[in-house]
Amino acid sequence: MSDHSPLALAQALIRCPSVTPEEGGALSFLADRLSRAGFSVERPVFSEPGTPDIQNLYARIGTAGPVLVFAGHTDVVPPGETEAWTHGPFSGEVADGFLYGRGAVDMKGGIACMLAATLAFLDRHRPDFGGSIAFLVTGDEEGPAVNGTVKLLDWAKARGERFDHCLLGEPTNPDTLGEMIKIGRRGSLTGRITVHGRQGHVAYPHRAENPIPGLLRLASALTADPLDGGTAHFDASNLEFTTIDVGNPATNVIPASAKAVFNVRFNDDWTADTLGAEIRRRLEAAAGNAVRFSLDLQPSNSPAFLTQPDAFVDRVADAIEAETGRRPALSTTGGTSDARFIKDACPVIEFGLVGRTMHETDERVAVADLDRLTAIYGRVLDAYF
């Protein structure tokens, strides 16, 4: 097996214990392979008070445009109880056609495929392939995500780097390789409602003001009617309550306040501001003069965004269809990713491995999928340049 094969590269990366925020040797391995291939490689470290310093990697080969960026992360979530794994979480063992290890799917396997495809492409097209290839890789995606991609992009912009398109190798396929390309992501908004009452004894309710019925009224106002009916590329926005609490262990005390937390995953019909205004309007209408409440809205750094289907999306879809025989769906489902930052630098889409076992005990990827994803990325490179 060649040490440039996606399997060998993925095994080497998995054997680096890069549990966020630790680098674990993963970025160093990647930097070595890229520099040996002729890339200019830099390793900026970013800091933020109250968070760990994070190592990142930026590499580029070529000086001309267009510039295609491969993006991803080498940090992984903790493995949990290692004794529960059939094969060690950092062993990189292969059994029954599967590569096991933390990050096999999310997303060291994807990075290995990007690297393998790029090395093979350069072997075919050196010295001039009519553009530039860049790697934008962070060690802070599974953690707070404040010293990673968002700062790496600012750092690159300050140096005059400009990108034409980005392919982010997150695991996008629910069950089978080739099912799905992510062309956008929903936004996220968290809200905290506090209904204010007056504490008292349950036997003397006229001396108290129970906040719980008011909170139930407000919660019903937010869930009774849908926020929207969805858009061309997004499902309907969805609001879910995640906790309701009065902090009251006593059975004979009316609490002074009642609190609830909700999260909205919203589509491109809304911004955080317009959605917040609609939520406040519904609450105020339901409360009238009968319910005293306060609302704290916390937008994440995850606005809804969409990369419009274009020639680049078609190139990736064509490559997938050529290797898998299926035309991928263009989707905006799922949670957030670093694409939410990259979208401000250039058009970005996501395509990677099958995500069924990501973050699980015995996370694993089919070795055949590593080979096929490498071939897909190779076809993208051939079509792009």
Curated annotation (Swiss-Prot):
Catalytic residues (UniProt): 75, 141
Reaction equations catalysed: N-succinyl-(2S,6S)-2,6-diaminopimelate + H2O = (2S,6S)-2,6-diaminopimelate + succinate
Positions of Zn(2+) 1 binding: 73, 106, 170
Cofactor requirements of the protein: Zn(2+); Co(2+)
Enzyme class, UniProt record, top EC level: hydrolase
InterPro entries: ArgE/DapE_CS, Bact_exopeptidase_dim_dom, DapE_proteobac, Peptidase_M20, Peptidase_M20_dimer, Peptidase_M20A
Gene3D superfamilies found in the cross-reference section: Zn peptidases
Function (record text): Catalyzes the hydrolysis of N-succinyl-L,L-diaminopimelic acid (SDAP), forming succinate and LL-2,6-diaminopimelate (DAP), an intermediate involved in the bacterial biosynthesis of lysine and meso-diaminopimelic acid, an essential component of bacterial cell walls.
Cross-referenced PROSITE patterns: ARGE_DAPE_CPG2_2 (PS00759)
Protein name: Succinyl-diaminopimelate desuccinylase
Keyword set includes Transcription regulation: no
Entry's family note: Belongs to the peptidase M20A family. DapE subfamily.
Cofactor remark from the record: Binds 2 Zn(2+) or Co(2+) ions per subunit.
Pfam family, one: Peptidase_M20
Superkingdom of the source species: Bacteria
GO molecular function: acetylornithine deacetylase activity; cobalt ion binding; succinyl-diaminopimelate desuccinylase activity; zinc ion binding
Transmembrane segments: none
Keywords: Amino-acid biosynthesis, Cobalt, Diaminopimelate biosynthesis, Hydrolase, Lysine biosynthesis, Metal-binding, Zinc
Positions bound to Zn(2+) 2: 106, 142, 359
Known partners and oligomeric status: Homodimer.
One of the GO biological process terms: diaminopimelate biosynthetic process
Listed pathway(s): Amino-acid biosynthesis; L-lysine biosynthesis via DAP pathway; LL-2,6-diaminopimelate from (S)-tetrahydrodipicolinate (succinylase route): step 3/3
Hydrolase in keyword set: yes
